Amino acid sequence: MTVKPELNEITPYLQFNRQQWGNFRKDTPLTLTESDLDKLQGQIEIVSLKEVTEIYLPLSRLLSFYVTARQTLQQATYQFLGKPEPKVPYIIGIAGSVAVGKSTTSRVLKALLSRWPDHPNVEVITTDGFLYSNAKLEKQGLMKRKGFPESYDMPSLLRVLNAIKSGQRNVRIPVYSHHYYDIVRGQYEIVDQPDIVILEGLNILQTGVRKTLQQLQVFVSDFFDFSLFVDAQAQVIQKWYIDRVLSFWRTTFKDPHSYFHYLTQMSETEVAAFAKHVWNEINKVNLMENILPYKNRAQLILEKAADHSIQKVYLRKI
């Protein structure tokens, strides 16, 4: 069966509805069980096996094609040079708003991609580890701008991406704790020449005005082999964000060591109002100014409905 995309000539994307995209699964086997999937769920987002089958399996198949093609190209380069070079990971960037489901998407893709024989070693990195510490943000008056571009140690992130793309071994990634809402000083995760790196972050597709030829500026997206944007209506994401805060309020915030433990002294109505205020004053502003304007730089867009299901897929024409 040939799948015909919904084609709009004024857009650089091929558009597929859920059924059309699901047909691209072909004979790709479903290797995840319900038990496997339970370990990948988000705080409020529940991904079903049906969602994996219809959306994520076709996506993993496409990405596997891309990764294998890049590996073949690298082998051709090594053959031309007459000597092996360090393995260069394939880097996938996943962007989108707070609470839109980037982390869940990253975990599901890691689980699926690692089951393909040509690229079993997949690592997920989050840009949260490159946020400045709370102490530094407070000193610079940026605590209310946490998550905005200026709150990240971009030079460190770019150095790490350069090291990974250069094939360096044992690259250290700073650890961020959502429980403490801060960088965990002295703790690192190690990335050691994986086949694929998935980088998840808010502003990773953002660019700026490049400097002069003498001072060329490098952007995070320059290191991507493939980029993906998780999208939904802002009003829908606002509800997801409030639901997520309330879910944490009922669970992890009860720990006295949690940064947001003080919220447990409030009523559910007060916490919901607090979350809505944070959304309107911080997260929505960041979405509109620094995230959404760069959506069309992604090679693939996953468009979600209010129930978290992906209803449309946009694939950039090659």
UniProtKB/Swiss-Prot annotation:
<dbReference type="GO" id="GO:0005737">
    <property type="term" value="C:cytoplasm"/>
</dbReference>
<keyword id="KW-0808">Transferase</keyword>
<dbReference type="InterPro" id="IPR027417">
    <property type="entry name" value="P-loop_NTPase"/>
</dbReference>
<keyword id="KW-0067">ATP-binding</keyword>
<keyword id="KW-0173">Coenzyme A biosynthesis</keyword>
<dbReference type="GO" id="GO:0004594">
    <property type="term" value="F:pantothenate kinase activity"/>
</dbReference>
<keyword id="KW-0418">Kinase</keyword>
<dbReference type="Pfam" id="PF00485">
    <property type="entry name" value="PRK"/>
</dbReference>
<dbReference type="GO" id="GO:0015937">
    <property type="term" value="P:coenzyme A biosynthetic process"/>
</dbReference>
<dbReference type="InterPro" id="IPR004566">
    <property type="entry name" value="PanK"/>
</dbReference>
<protein>
    <recommendedName>
        <fullName>Pantothenate kinase</fullName>
        <ecNumber>2.7.1.33</ecNumber>
    </recommendedName>
</protein>
<dbReference type="GO" id="GO:0005524">
    <property type="term" value="F:ATP binding"/>
</dbReference>
<feature type="binding site">
    <location>
        <begin position="96"/>
        <end position="103"/>
    </location>
    <ligand>
        <name>ATP</name>
    </ligand>
</feature>
<dbReference type="InterPro" id="IPR006083">
    <property type="entry name" value="PRK/URK"/>
</dbReference>
<comment type="pathway">
    <text>Cofactor biosynthesis; coenzyme A biosynthesis; CoA from (R)-pantothenate: step 1/5.</text>
</comment>
<keyword id="KW-0963">Cytoplasm</keyword>
<keyword id="KW-0547">Nucleotide-binding</keyword>
<comment type="similarity">
    <text>Belongs to the prokaryotic pantothenate kinase family.</text>
</comment>
